[in-house]
Amino acid sequence: MRYIALLRGINISGKNKISMPELKIALGEKGFGDVKTYLNSGNVLFSDDEPDAVKLAERIRTIILEIFHLEIPVFVIPQDELKFLLSKAPSWWGSDSKDIYDNLIFAIAPNSIETVAEKIGEPSAELEKVQIYGNAAFWSFDRKLYAKANWWKKTAAPGIGEMITIRTANTLRKIAEM
């Protein structure tokens, strides 16, 4: 089965540095098939026979700890499931508007998106929109006023940030088709 692993918080402002070519080699050497990476932000595609995405995430997390000596949360989703999820996007999400920034928030096991949403609270009216589907949340916000948006302020906050990983609509569309 084809999977996508999303690594949380790597290669940001010189922190949690992981070389994508080195990670690709390491995962291949540890038995993952047809490993590919996209961008430097921790997007990894691979094949494996394991049906449990949470077990795969734990295997990848352990490999990263062993090779790179970093404790990195990992979210894994079957590629077909990501495609299905993207097909369920609300009409306001993923537009071509340069004024709006569209993201998808994934809850990293054992967390649920409902718990994350409860901790963050209601989105700021007029500034952002949120719609939960499965264990993810479609989230869009006004690029000019993002700093005033409730979800923007809280997604990186202690107690919430480590529960999630976030990707843009464009990144997810690309890796869904790779």
PLM region spans:
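Surface-exposed, charge/polar-rich loops and edge strands
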Residues: M1-S41, L45-M178
